[in-house]
Design a protein with these regions (language model features):
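Interfacial loop-to-helix junctions that mark the boundaries of transmembrane helices
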Residues: 1-6, 53-64, 90, 130-144
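Single transmembrane alpha-helix segments in multi-pass membrane proteins
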Residues: 2-49, 80-90, 94
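Hydrophobic alpha-helical transmembrane segments
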Residues: 4, 37-41, 59-68, 93-98, ...
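Helix-loop-helix "hairpin" substructures at the membrane interface of multi-pass membrane proteins
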Residues: 10, 136-210
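Alpha-helical transmembrane segments of polytopic integral membrane proteins
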Residues: 18-27, 46, 73-79, 102, ...
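Hydrophobic core segments of alpha-helical transmembrane domains in multi-pass membrane transport
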Residues: 43-47, 66-73, 101-110, 147-156, ...
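Alpha-helical transmembrane segments within multi-pass membrane transporters and channels
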Residues: 55-102
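Transmembrane helix-bundle core of multi-pass membrane transporters
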Residues: 84, 91-161, 187-188
Length: 210
């Protein structure tokens, strides 16, 4: 049971990662392999942001900062690597090759700057634990679980209850019909990449802090 409790917070972060992959796949029908590279990059960004202060800022500030960095990174990758493919209406294979290329590029950049060194996030909280019966819950695992569940709940609301969520679902189901209904697919795709980038930023810093 203790192993299950310890794995729940990690599973919640993996859920964020999976949603980031799935939301891009739902629109463009390809697996964005660059998403994993963005997660790694955001983990490093979060680490250096925390470590650059004598007194590290509150953890939510670091999460917000890496989220914004993830959004910027995702939009940049879309602009540089994927937008031209969309304009040329190239086969899905081109997206596949472009995403692998970007993933390798990010990996090599991280290797150049950070090598094989091991970095550890500054302690976010004191290593306190609380008990429910014989089960132990650490403060950081509890925080990671809460943040992940809140983000997933917000995303679920946005996708199901807002106009942009309706537009995303419409483009995912039938891109041609959605264009006839006046939905700007370019804006929807940018929004999807921004959401995926935000999830990469959040999951990267949560994995790093864990």
């Amino acid at each position: 049971l203790q192993l299950l409790v310890s794995g729940i917070s990690l599973g919640a972060v993996y859920a964020l990662i999976a949603v980031g992959f799935a939301i891009v796949f739902s629109i463009l029908k390809f697996s964005n392999f660059a998403h994993g590279g963005m997660i790694s990059a955001c983990a490093f960004i979060g680490y250096f942001f925390q470590a650059s202060f004598d007194n590290p800022p509150p953890f939510y500030v670091t999460v917000l900062f890496t989220t914004l960095c993830g959004v910027a990174m995702a939009l940049l990758i879309d602009t540089v690597a994927y937008r031209r493919i969309r304009k040329k209406q190239a086969p899905t294979l081109y997206y596949f090759l472009a995403s692998i290329t970007v993933a390798i590029l990010i990996e090599q950049i991280l290797n150049v700057f950070f090598g094989k060194n091991i970095y550890a996030f500054p302690a976010v909280f004191s290593s306190t634990t609380f008990h429910i019966g014989s089960l132990r819950f650490s403060s950081i695992d509890t925080l990671i679980l809460v943040i992940s569940l809140v983000i997933l709940a917000i995303l679920l609301y946005v996708i199901n209850k807002t106009r942009i969520g309706l537009a995303i679902r419409a483009v995912a189901i039938n891109p041609a019909a959605s264009r006839l209904m006046g939905i700007n697919s370019s804006v929807v795709i940018m929004t999807v990449f921004a959401i995926a980038g935000a999830l990469a930023g959040i999951s990267g810093v949560l994995l790093g802090a864990k």
